[in-house]
Amino acid sequence: MPGFIGREQHTVDDKGRLLIPARFRRKFLRQKDEESAEKAKRHEVLYVFKADDGSLELYEPAVWNEKEHQLLKLSDFNPEERLLTTMIYARLDQLELDRSGRIALSREMLDHAGIEREAVVIGANAKMIVWNPDRLTQLLADNAGSFSGLANRYVKGDGKSGVS
């Protein structure tokens, strides 16, 4: 199944609620005819991660569970691995979607992303990325000349990443 693709801007209400675009919700919300109630219930949450670039990354449970599986391999007895685990989980939250398809972002999450009234939600295949519209515009403008070089370096024509 194709991942999340597209970009939409939405208003964040006074309670910090952000509407997840309907086309993205359709990718992971319950499908009553195909899934059991228990399995569908697990799909009504999103994992929200505060990224280093000032955005918020949203993951559906199945995708986050894959990342979590990797984190479980880290040792609590290795200081660097323990630090990484702490840093990741200190930036992570699990949020339920309400009946209107919104998530309630905490003040901490909103402040991290610099979001006040408007937010841009970008579908980025396995995740969604939430940006302050002005920050996103500035990021894209500042890096406009980098696109071809980055694409050439990291995305090969054969579909394989150039990163080893």
Swiss-Prot record:
Its main location: cytoplasm. Keywords: Cytoplasm, DNA-binding, Repeat, Transcription, Transcription regulation. GO terms for biological process: negative regulation of DNA-templated transcription initiation. CDD domains: MraZ_C, MraZ_N. It is found in: Cytoplasm, Nucleoid. The keyword Transmembrane helix does not apply. Residues 7-63, 92-135 form the SpoVT-AbrB domain. Belongs to the MraZ family. This is Transcriptional regulator MraZ.
